[in-house]
Amino acid sequence: MIQAETQLNAADNSGAKRLYCIKVLGGTRKRYASVGDIIVVSVKEAIPNAKVKKGDVLKAVVVRTQKEVRRPDGSYIKFDDNSAVLINQAKEPIGTRIFGPVARELRAKQFMKIISLAPEVL
């Protein structure tokens, strides 16, 4: 459950380390983002000589949340951290690698490139 002002980890090799949620996209009443939702983020911490710099405002897709997500079969999945992957205007990841597992819910939201780059899909 991600909302405005939430800090997240970057789960890719775009160069960002910490992200800060500015806005949850999806209408005026959408307050919280879950796995697979797109958010607007600011890069709070980045490594030197990277694709993104500190202060950049980009879009990202949430891939892991500490708040559990209920699945249609009644099971729940939750992760140890809140993480997102930075994406461009075409909804393709900026980085070339994804770190850590990602949730299966991304497949239903058509983020196939992130699914294929991820080492594990839970």
UniProtKB/Swiss-Prot annotation:
GO biological process: translation
Keyword Transmembrane helix listed: no
GO molecular function: large ribosomal subunit rRNA binding; structural constituent of ribosome
Keyword Nuclease: no
Domain of life, per lineage: Bacteria
Keywords: Ribonucleoprotein, Ribosomal protein, RNA-binding, rRNA-binding
GO cellular component: cytosolic large ribosomal subunit
Pfam families reported in the protein's UniProt record: Ribosomal_L14 (PF00238)
Subunit structure comment from the entry: Part of the 50S ribosomal subunit. Forms a cluster with proteins L3 and L19. In the 70S ribosome, L14 and L19 interact and together make contacts with the 16S rRNA in bridges B5 and B8.
Role of this protein: Binds to 23S rRNA. Forms part of two intersubunit bridges in the 70S ribosome.
NCBIfam families in UniProt: rplN_bact (TIGR01067)
UniProt similarity note: Belongs to the universal ribosomal protein uL14 family.
Protein name (record): Large ribosomal subunit protein uL14
